[in-house]
Design a protein with these regions (language model features):
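Short amphipathic alpha-helices and their capping/turn residues within compact interaction modules
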Residues: 15, 19, 42, 72, ...
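Context-gated lysine
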Residues: 35, 56, 128, 158, ...
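C-terminal, extended alpha-helical scaffolding domains
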Residues: 1-122, 131-142, 166
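Extended amphipathic alpha-helical scaffold segments
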Residues: 49, 120-165, 181-186
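Acidic-enriched, low-complexity/disordered segments with a strong bias for Aspartate over Glutamate
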Residues: 3, 12, 17, 96, ...
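Eukaryotic terminal intrinsically disordered regions
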Residues: 168-171, 175-260
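Charged, amphipathic alpha-helical oligomerization/scaffolding segments
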Residues: 32, 143-146, 171-174, 178
Length: 260
């Protein structure tokens, strides 16, 4: 669809690199633009056929959501960059991470996510090595890209690629949450730093997977986001209908009992 390509081009121009520092004034301007664009479009579409209006509105909604997400991701990236450049904080993080019970984490990950022990072990070792080397944010981003590529390689060109990609996100999130849980229980001094890093890496993983799915489906990322939004709205609508039907049936049953 032309609208998707147009808005994707706009995203690529406005935020060409989600990790590169953006001035605060520009970030605020982008957010204000995203906040008002949908309103402006709706006002300009008065009298337009409903179907055309829905198509235009869904595309611009995906565009605005993308701008909001990418500016939030960029904000996290700049906050995390400060942590990753602080050698004393990195040393504390490595010290706290070495106390985590990774054997327990791996056992639970294997049971819940069916993650291979060798893969989980490799991720642990790579993460610790990157901390020890005081890797830059860009180096971390390269590693995350390699993790995604490695995890999805066997599904390349297969019809279940998108499903596998979403499953990978769930597994990644569960595994990282187990590590954060252990750090919390141990009252780790660097918990705040780990929490920030985890937020950034989760969001960046989502960003990477979204683009991998778009590439596999030969679509723009905006189109993938729009598809997801439509699916979400459809599920919510189905739930509402089911809720209404249940209430109607309950009401009818109550009336019958009353008459009886």
């Amino acid at each position: 669809m032309v609208d998707y390509q147009f808005y994707q081009n706009m995203v690529d121009v406005i935020i060409p690199d989600v990790l590169r520092s953006i001035p605060n004034a520009l970030t605020q301007a982008i957010r204000n633009f995203a906040k008002n664009l949908e309103i402006w479009l709706c006002e300009s579409m008065v009298g337009v056929p409903e179907r055309l209006s829905q198509i235009k509105t869904s595309a611009v909604s995906a565009f605005c959501q993308t701008l909001r997400r990418y500016t939030s991701l960029n904000h996290l990236a700049q906050a995390a960059r400060a942590v990753l450049q602080n050698s004393s904080q990195i040393a504390q993080m490595l010290n706290d991470l070495n106390r985590v019970d990774f054997h327990n984490v791996q056992e639970q990950a294997a049971w819940v996510c069916q993650c291979e022990t060798s893969v989980v072990q490799r991720l642990e070792n790579d993460f610790k090595a990157a901390l020890q080397q005081q890797s830059s944010l860009e180096q971390w981003a390269t590693w995350l890209q390699l993790v995604v590529d490695s995890a999805l390689e066997e599904y390349r060109g297969k019809p279940n690629y998108a499903k596998a990609a979403r499953q990978f996100l769930l597994k990644w999130s569960f595994y990282s949450s187990m590590v954060i849980r252990d750090l919390t229980l141990r009252s780790a001094s660097s918990f705040g730093s780990f929490h920030l890093i985890r937020l950034l890496y989760d969001e960046y993983m989502f960003y990477l997977v979204e683009h991998k799915i778009a590439e596999a489906q030969q679509k723009t990322a905006i189109a993938v986001i729009c598809d997801r939004m439509r699916t979400s709205i459809g599920l919510e609508f189905d739930y509402q209908l089911e809720f209404i039907d249940d209430n109607i049936e309950s009401g009818s049953a109550a009336k019958r009992m009353k008459h009886e």
